[in-house]
Amino acid sequence: MSKNRRKSLKKEPVIPKTDFSFYESKIYIIATIIMFHIVPLVFVMMGENGQLLLLQFFLMMLNPMFIALSGLIYGIKQGFNFKFPLFMAIISMVSIPMYYQFDAAANMMMTTIIMCIVYAIFSFAATVIGAFVQRLLRL
């Protein structure tokens, strides 16, 4: 009996992997679009002070925390898949050149690439942790 239990435990992955579905992840995608495209638009309309606040507060602090939190919640509820972190990074990548003003085009392009990679890493790690937590809670 104990050998059968060991075999069944080996077949189950540590991190449950699921298929990506737009229907199940639409709330996360809509929240990300609001966070990365609508909220920055309000700060851009506020003038120079709003843009400075947007650059310092949103780009470096609030956006990575939002990405990590939404990835964690998604991982707990849906499990892990590779497509969700990629969608989060793509949605964020589009907003950086649109709302964040930089002095030179090269600086803007480099910041866009770096922040896209950072957001993808945050989302990937949070989704993996969320899926692991999901697995622990179901045991």
Where are these regions (language model features)?
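N-terminal juxtamembrane cytosolic/stromal segments of multi-pass membrane proteins
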Residues: 1-24
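Membrane-helix boundary elements
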Residues: 21-54
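Membrane-water interface at the C-terminal end of transmembrane alpha helices
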Residues: 22-31, 121-139
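Aromatic-anchored segments of alpha-helical transmembrane domains
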Residues: 33-42, 89-100
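Alpha-helical transmembrane segments of polytopic membrane proteins
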Residues: 53-67, 112-124
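Canonical alpha-helical transmembrane segments
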Residues: 62-81
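Cytoplasmic-side transmembrane-helix entry/capping segments in multi-pass membrane proteins
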Residues: 81-90
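Membrane-helix boundary connector in multi-pass membrane proteins
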Residues: 96-118
